[in-house]
C-alpha cells in the first residue's frame, strides 16, 4: 500500500502524518478544503501546516462533501486515511448541520463511492475521537463499573462538577476507558464521530476493504493552530498568555484530559495502516495518564516565563465532559504502540515552538460570546 490518500492532510495531524509517510517512501495525496478557521484567510501566508506539505504531496483543494473531489482524490490509491472533519466540541452544539454534513456525510460519500465504483482501496483508516465515550468509564463503590450520563445543569450551577452513578447517584471514581466501553457521546461532534466509525466498520468488510479506527485523545504539539479558539486548550491558553490576557479555568480546574503528543499519534496511525492484524479493530490512542486543566495553565505560564491571572471561575459549558483517559492495552498488544512522549517532555517542546511563532490574535472571547448567545456557556 504505497499510494495513500490523506483527507484533511493539511491539518495538524494530517500534515505531520503526510511528512512521515513521505519519509517512508509512500506516495501521498492530500484532499483538504483549507478551512479558514484552521488555515486563515490566505493559507500561503497564514498556514505553516499547508506550506509544509503543499510541494511534497499531490495536493487537491476540495471537500469531502463533494463526490467529484472524492473521485479525483481516490484515483490510483491503495489506502485512505480519513482525518478530514469539523472538530470543535462546543461549536458543534450550535453548528449542527455543518458537523453532520462534513463528518457523517463526507464519510458516507466515501463509502458510497467505494461500494459502487471500481477502485484499488485495501484499507480505510478513520479518525474517531475519545468524544464518543462521553464521560467514559467509572467505578461506583456500590454498583461497580458504571457509565455516567451527561452532567446536569442543576448540579453544575451549584458547583458539583463530578460525575454521579447513574444507578444510585453517588459520586464515582474515574478509571481508564477501554475500547469496549459504552458509547455515550455528550456533543454533536461526539455523535458524528461515533456514526463515522460505525459506518466504516459496517460497510468496509462487505466490500473487501479493511477498516481501522483510532479514538484519539487530546492531541497537541508543534504545528497546531494557535488562532483557532474552538479546539485545543494548550493553543487557547498559549495565545491568551502571549497576549497578556488572563486565563479563565472552567469548573473548578480539576477536570482532566489525556494529552497525547503529535509524534505518538502519527506513530500509532502508521502502525494502523501497516499492521495486517489491525484490520477490523478500534484503538484508543493516548498516554493513559490524566492531567488536570489547572496544571496545564500553570505549566504553560512557567514555560513562557509570563505571569497572567488564572481564575477558577466556576463557569462551565454544556456538552463538556468531566474526565477521560485512555486504556491503551489493545494498541500495545496488536500494534506494538508505546507512547514515547510524557506530558512534561511534550509540553516543553510545544512551548519552545510557540516561543518562535508570531503572536496570534486572541479570538477566545469571541468564541465564548457565541456560546453564551446559544445558552451553552454558564
Residue ranges of model-derived segments:
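Glycine/proline-rich active-site loop of Rossmann-fold NAD(P)-dependent oxidoreductases
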Residues: 194, 207-212, 219-235, 243-245, ...
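Non-catalytic, hydrophobic alpha-helical segments
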Residues: 265, 269, 285, 296, ...
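Conserved short acidic donor-positioning loop in nucleotide-sugar-dependent glycosyltransferases
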Residues: 33-34, 288, 316
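Amphipathic terminal alpha-helices
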Residues: 26, 343-378
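N-terminal Rossmann-like NAD(P)+-binding domain of SDR-like oxidoreductases, especially those catalyzing
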Residues: 1-217
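Conserved C-terminal active-site "lid" loop/helix of NAD(P)H-dependent oxidoreductases
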Residues: 262, 317-338, 359
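C-terminal "lid/loop" region of Rossmann-like NAD(P)-dependent oxidoreductases
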Residues: 252, 282-283, 292-297, 305-323, ...
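Hydrophobic "lid"/C-terminal helical patch
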Residues: 17, 269-273, 297-300, 347-354
